[in-house]
Amino acid sequence: MRFLIQSLCFCLLPLLAVAAPPYQMPAGAADHDAPDIVAGYRAIFTCSAHFFARRPLSDILKVELVDVQGKGFPDPVIDEKRQLVFASDPNNTYKRIAAYRPDMGCTLLPPHWQLSDVPRLPNVAYAPAPDVSALAFPAGDKVGLPADGVDPSYPQLASVLTKAFDGVTHAKVPGTVTTAVLVIKRDKQNHYKLIAERYRPGFGKHSGYRTWSTAKGISAALLAIASQQGMLELDKPVSIPEWPEGDPRRQITYQQLMRMSSGLYSGGANSAAVYFGGQDVVSAATGTPLEVKPGTRWKYANNDTLLLMRSLRHLLADDLRYLRFPYDELLHPLGMYHTQMEVDHLGNFIASSQVYTTARDLARFGIFLDQDGVHQGKRLLPEGWIQFVSTPAPARSVVAGEWGYGAQFWLLDTMPEVPNGTYTTFGNKGQYVTVVPGHDLVIVRTGVDPNGIEYKQDRLVVDVLKALKQIP
């Protein structure tokens, strides 16, 4: 059952008619330690974690804000009634505001916007989500696992879960912090069953958290749906209205953006001005020059994903349809009712990172991928799309012992003992949705790993497979 649209407040002028913000950072990159960026980080994270995930500030300070604590910044202030968060730097020079709308998530206001500008934010309201508590997973939330979270048919998974949470076994450097691990297996009747599920204290089946770059996998699926509906072709140039006729960037194809080989200048994974500064997506993503011929260089770039979503908005040519598209065409059909895709102040999805969801919703997404983009007998993704995203990008060399890259997904089958064809999303701080196609498995791991500490998802995959006796 999909949400039904009830009302729309989208009081902005058309995108190109809106005055540009007073600053535009190349590629949306910025100094992560700049006081205005840190204040923005604290505002947007507190807003999403509190109003969407329903977590108290005391916990948010220890989890979401742990990497920016100890710098003399005052605690963010939460306005429950108006659903706002205020944050500032130690000198109170930079005052940042994040605003929550129940069906849109949180948006960080740009520095030049005031409290009186909050009503200008895009806001689509939906009917309440259906009650699926009595439906069996993945359609609903009925699971029936015992207290330890392990299906009695697979007792050997108990030790795997213990290792996943110990902060050492699957860590490149000790200190990982796992918040959830889910293992889903398809049986002989083609039913997907949750056979293991465990959470860190303070988190649970409805605990939302930022996906970081796992959002790129969701964005890829949205572009795939647009392709299935005849809006675009992978090998055709991407449709970006900000690039005029004769602009060499108009040669860049959808496929090259998907494979992180656009050839554009980029801040790489640094999009701090967009994520935490309040810069709009379009000025950040469309304003960078071409450095090399498209398709000849692989460079991980948030902007490539943001350009894909900018193109989707242009192709749809309808702001309301654009805001509804992820929910109407993907999330709600899959039963992902606990997922929100956040937007900037001009209504652009920040879909390279800023999606909030639960581990169970990520599992639903992984099941959909394992079904080759078919849901309840209906093909949502083009045939062959999953093969495309899980095939190595031509511009990136395959190196044994290093993860490969496909198209908005990472490839794990370059790692020891990992089966061929295994692919995964990968978000900062350890957000993974991993599909092992030949073994009927989906493995979700979420975390709040400290900066500089990486969780080894490939080792979790191998441990699960060994526990299930699917590999020696």
List each language-model region with its residue ranges:
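Active-site SXXK
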Residues: 181, 188, 192, 209-235, ...
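Non-catalytic propeptide/linker segments at domain boundaries
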Residues: 88-173
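A short, well-structured edge-of-sheet supersecondary motif
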Residues: 86, 159-203, 434, 440-444
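Active-site Gly/Thr loop motif
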Residues: 336-340, 387-443
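Active-site-proximal alpha-helical segments within enzyme catalytic domains
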Residues: 220, 304-312, 353-374, 431-447
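Short, charged, amphipathic alpha-helices and their helix-cap/turn boundaries
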Residues: 189-198, 271-294, 320-339
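Active-site helix/loop module of the DD-peptidase/beta-lactamase fold
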Residues: 229-263, 287-289, 317-353
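Conserved catalytic neighborhood of penicillin-recognizing serine enzymes
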Residues: 244-273, 277-296, 301-306, 357-360
